[in-house]
Amino acid sequence: MQAVTAAAAAGQLLTDTRRGPRCRARLGTTRLSWTGRFAVEAFAGQCQSSATTVMHKFSAISQAARPRRNTKRQCSDDYPALQAGCSEVNWDQNGSNANRLEEIRGDVLKKLRSFYEFCRPHTIFGTIIGITSVSLLPMKSIDDFTVTVLRGYLEALTAALCMNIYVVGLNQLYDIQIDKINKPGLPLASGEFSVATGVFLVLAFLIMSFSIGIRSGSAPLMCALIVSFLLGSAYSIEAPFLRWKRHALLAASCILFVRAILVQLAFFAHMQQHVLKRPLAATKSLVFATLFMCCFSAVIALFKDIPDVDGDRDFGIQSLSVRLGPQRVYQLCISILLTAYGAATLVGASSTNLFQKIITVSGHGLLALTLWQRAQHFEVENQARVTSFYMFIWKLFYAEYFLIPFVQ
């Protein structure tokens, strides 16, 4: 734009420059008079005015054509108000971008936290620890820990986790109204996730679980996934002959069969038979794990309904806590766990290996003592303490899987 303006001004300059000789020619050829429009003084004044105009235009052209250096400094010296305005605009734009990025970051973190709650992390941790512990039982020496074994373990774990998310997600989809009373912080009950989002997540993880199982080619793993799918669906889906969670015995049976029997037997067989290519044979630790986890899974199935008694009663869920009352169910759960720990201590004492005997006896004794002390401060009317105690039972569940490999 400056180049075009300079060219136009240069053309005008040439035109005005040519007017100088015309003025002189007219001065020599025109008859002069001392009065009137063509007086010498007036004519000379016009020529002088034209010359002055030419000089000003030439100066303007030179200024426009001259390259600007240190534009920032010139803007600062000549136009301080303009530079202040530019700085303010830049600051506003940077601040707006930073705020927008912070909002996006906050939204992403919020969605991740909601997804974390959607997965029911205490069940995820239980699945990870349980499958890891059971997968170690067939190992006889350090030579068994190979890349093939690691791949087989990861296939089983990933497929099981995807199925776990399907089961807990499906339960939340059918329990939205109940969870608004019992667990209002869950993403579907709170409205953080829409029903469409929940359906998408449930179907996606179901497909991933079966895809991994089929790709592995493991019959025990596929058996575990299919049974988990069937029982998890029957537990939650509202349909004739389904929605087994309405009935205390059927609900407890679903949880007990999956957590106590299926996890131990199916994943042990997967590692022993499919991965290590050894004949399937039960071990002392496998039998102990199955029997002990039957007791523990029954406790989890019964105790989980104590915090939910209000919502279950309102929606016709006939859990044992609704029928017998939370206090009686709580006392039953504590009795079952203490009995199981006593039996585990006797099993550990029968071990021929001194180190394993010390670990199993002292470990189960310490867990039983911790449970008894914690039970002294339990208040069934205090919702916060009931929920906290339920999560404490899950921690005992995790701890037991660390002791199971030492039972030989």
From Swiss-Prot:
Xref: Pfam families: UbiA (PF01040)
Keyword Chloroplast: yes
First-tier enzyme category under EC: transferase
Highest taxon listed in the record's lineage: Eukaryota
GO terms classed as biological process: vitamin E biosynthetic process
Transmembrane annotation, as ranges: 122-142, 156-176, 194-214, 221-241, 248-268, 286-306, 329-349, 352-372, 386-406
One GO cellular component term noted in the UniProt record for this chain: chloroplast membrane
Entry-linked InterPro entries: AtHST-like, UbiA_prenyltransferase, UbiA_sf
Classification via NCBIfam families: PRK12887.1
PANTHER family named in the record: HOMOGENTISATE GERANYLGERANYLTRANSFERASE, CHLOROPLASTIC, HOMOGENTISATE SOLANESYLTRANSFERASE, CHLOROPLASTIC
General function of this protein: Involved in the synthesis of tocotrienol (vitamin E). Catalyzes the condensation of homogentisate and geranylgeranyl diphosphate to form 2-methyl-6-geranylgeranylbenzoquinol. Possesses low activity with phytyl diphosphate as substrate.
Name this polypeptide is given: Homogentisate geranylgeranyltransferase
